[in-house]
Amino acid sequence: MNILFCNYEYPPLGGGGGVINALLAEELATRHEVTVLTSQGLGLPAESVVNGVRVVRAPVFFRSQQAAANVPSMLAFLPMGIAAGKRLIKANRYDVINTHFVLPTGPVGAALARFGKLPHVLSVHGGDLYDPSKWISPHRHFVLRTWIKRLLRQADSLVGQSRNTIDNVHTYYDASLDVARIPLGIKRPAVDAARRADYGFTDDQVLLVTVGRLVARKAMDQLISVLKDTDRPDAHLVIIGSGPQEQALQQQSRELGVADRVHFMGQTDERDKFRLLQVSDIFVSTSQHEGFGLVYLEAMASGLPVVCYDYGGQTDFLTDGVTGHVVPLNDTALFTECCRKLISDREASQKISDRNLELVEDLYIENCARQYEQLFEDLIKKQQVQ
């Protein structure tokens, strides 16, 4: 197959949605021709080949951060992405288009599918449908809801990565739509012996670690409060990621008197991210919603128990008392108590760690890619018959 992916964000830009697209594209590129159409910014080249994937970047304007997008740059991607995509379709014979995120990428993928008369698979990731932390979340606005309904209905096939994402499609947009559930996956992490001393930590510290963009939806201010409330001076919080809330979080840690125990590691590469996970003790997340939550899989693959909230796609594979603790949304008192238990009971924590290493075996990228591959092939055959 010759596959064209469309995604507004693709590494190094953006967050988890771009990461999963890259993992999927790279896995499929081992046996197919794969091109990704994405946005250009921050000095990135207009075109490159990354791990066997041809990446074509349409120029956009006003993007100033690697981790977070803005409305002007998203709007600019619509005409620029369509123009770049049409040039690609004229020069190449693609078999299928897979668009990731109904907004802002959906209009680009839909236009290119019509232009090239190609089957169109639209993958929705959660935040493009529903984000409780944002006033501009599409589910709150009639015009955006109407636009999304149209894009969802136009696609030849829809994919959601979790029951929660599919529920949001049906609740806020169109209950009649058929949405395939294909769980996401991660790349199996390399065995890379890491030492705490490499990152300035000691063996007598208890490391709570989190990964994510420092934005409102991640609610990392709660984690800093949780750290203080554990009443464990040996507990430290390791934050991997960057974003617009970093200064406010640093100020909060100073005000609460825990600045010496909150460690902002910034945006790391994959190797350092997994090394930091491997030297930590517990993965924690107070994210208000995740369409799926790749970071939870990364934590499990690193042998960490997970403490998180019960709202989002992670509830498809995380179970309270089995993979760690799944806490009612925003119950910070219970969240803190669960962290205390795992810190205090190292034997129970180790059992959870061992179990998570077993459970994550079904959630690596090769399984996700096989399901997408089958969907693409079925859709192509269906179009050929018609």
Report residues per predicted region.
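Conserved acidic donor-binding segment of nucleotide-sugar-dependent glycosyltransferases
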Residues: 320-321, 325-332, 341-346
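N-terminal subdomain of nucleotide-sugar transferases
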Residues: 1-54, 384
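Aromatic "clamp/platform" in nucleotide-sugar-dependent glycosyltransferases that forms part
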Residues: 288
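Nucleotide-sugar donor phosphate/pyrophosphate-binding loop at the beta->alpha transition
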Residues: 118-121, 129-150
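Conserved donor-binding/catalytic core segment of Leloir-type glycosyltransferases
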Residues: 4, 201-218, 224-227
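A short, well-ordered alpha-helix in the C-terminal region of glycosyltransferases
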Residues: 334, 341, 348-362, 371-374
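Short hydrophobic beta-strand element within catalytic cores of glycosyltransferases
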Residues: 305-308, 318
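Helix-loop-beta element that forms the nucleotide-linked donor phosphate-binding surface
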Residues: 166-186
